[in-house]
Amino acid sequence: KRFLTSASEASIFNYGTSDVPTLQIRGDLGTQASLTGLTAYSLETTVADDNGEPSFNGNALGVFEKVRNFTYSASGAGTLDIDNIPREAFLNAIHLFPAADVITNVEVFVDNVKVWDASKERMTEVCTGSGRTVAAGDYHIDFLLNNALGSQLTLAGTSDFRLRITHSGTISLTAYAQYLTDFATA
């Protein structure tokens, strides 16, 4: 993550295993028929207690980014209100991938307060100004564009979180929500 600029921020995503009984990592190798083997490595560290002695408590899993996807659709031009995206403690970004280039504006509301309102053109300016490339038709709401850990949208304790998407024609889209979460809520 390019927004993790200090050692303490970078260590937030270290995967400790003291509280994990098993760990399974799955991947899709696709059409890599020529792949003859896969090698995995585990880096082990000794955790010290306050006196500098080895601690057998180890590191806990910590926090990590979770991505969940949802699909939505509406016929004709108009607005699509989405109010059923699950709320986690922190939202890093929402990425909208419609089947056709019909999104004209998106608003985000948290407890009836508008926290985002941008046309497709304005969103593209914001993203490209931060070094991102936006594919035609896609819409991104990224709260970490300023590279500051802690600028995520806080959703913990909120009772209302919704998107209002204005679209110029029939819309069918997949929304990807990126959360900062911990092992207990994964």
Regions flagged by a language model, labelled:
Residues 1-186:
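Beta-strand-centric surfaces of beta-sandwich/beta-rich domains
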